[in-house]
Amino acid sequence: MYLKRNIINMQRSFSRQFHISVRNSIQSSKPLSNSTPLKGCSVGTILIRSPILTRQPSEFEKSIYKYNAELWNELSDPLPAEFYFKKGSVGEKDWQERQKTLKGKESPFETIFGKERKEMESNKLLDSATHLQSRVTEADTKNDERSTLRSLDKSLYLLVKKSKSSGWQFPNTPVTSSEKALHLLCQDLLKNILDENSLTWLVARHPLALLKTEQEKTFLLRARLLNGLDVPNLQNVYDWVWCTYDELKNKLSPSSWDSVKNILSDRL
């Protein structure tokens, strides 16, 4: 009992001394001036145009879908023809004829509805909006990297060049004062390079990645481009490109690519 009381007193004494030392150190430290520039520090934005189309399935996925469809057809219950067709009726004879033509066919759709499909295609509406559009756009054909209308099934990331001699990098701006939060600086940055009508959404207020060099540290925040199909020319930059994930490796510096390759993906 005596030993336990001594241990409790020692813990209280240590805790009291620790809090006093922390309070004294805080009081003795000088407050950081809000107007002090943060040298070698900048904030950037990973601006993403989200995928617009679903991705194309791989050959392996296509084979799985085909196998599952065939298996489902084999395991499905046969149609109770005696319930739907009267014995000896014209409908029963037509049904039996169609069943004979289905033997050995992988898909019975064309055999059963082939005639109806041709009639439907011959009576197409004149409105072009009802027709299927190609997944390959004009920007894909011309390899226009400035357009957001390319690679519609993948995410696109904005890279800029500040001058002719500089390399490709994410849009960034130096942090000249500690009075403004990082996410507010990112919003001002996007307003500076994009049109005022462009709509963006900052995903979070905290940094997603850190690009660190000997001269500078760049904190990256993530933002999404909401009007991804109508992006005007960028302002206050020398050049810009919208890159897929695979193209980032060839554009960014090796150190920058190593910092972001594990936090970005082909479809983000």
UniProtKB/Swiss-Prot annotation:
Domain of life: Eukaryota
Main location: mitochondrion
Feature: transit peptide: 1-25
One family name in Pfam for this protein: MRP-L46
GO molecular function: structural constituent of ribosome
Keywords: Mitochondrion, Ribonucleoprotein, Ribosomal protein, Transit peptide
GO cellular component: mitochondrial large ribosomal subunit; mitochondrion
InterPro entries the record matches: Ribosomal_mL46, Ribosomal_mL46_N, Ribosomal_mL46_NUDIX
One record GO biological process: mitochondrial translation
Location of the protein in the cell: Mitochondrion
Subunit text: Component of the mitochondrial large ribosomal subunit (mt-LSU). Mature yeast 74S mitochondrial ribosomes consist of a small (37S) and a large (54S) subunit. The 37S small subunit contains a 15S ribosomal RNA (15S mt-rRNA) and at least 32 different proteins. The 54S large subunit contains a 21S rRNA (21S mt-rRNA) and at least 45 different proteins.
Function: Component of the mitochondrial ribosome (mitoribosome), a dedicated translation machinery responsible for the synthesis of mitochondrial genome-encoded proteins, including at least some of the essential transmembrane subunits of the mitochondrial respiratory chain. The mitoribosomes are attached to the mitochondrial inner membrane and translation products are cotranslationally integrated into the membrane.
Entry's family note: Belongs to the mitochondrion-specific ribosomal protein mL46 family.
Protein name: Large ribosomal subunit protein mL46
Gene encoding the protein: mrpl17
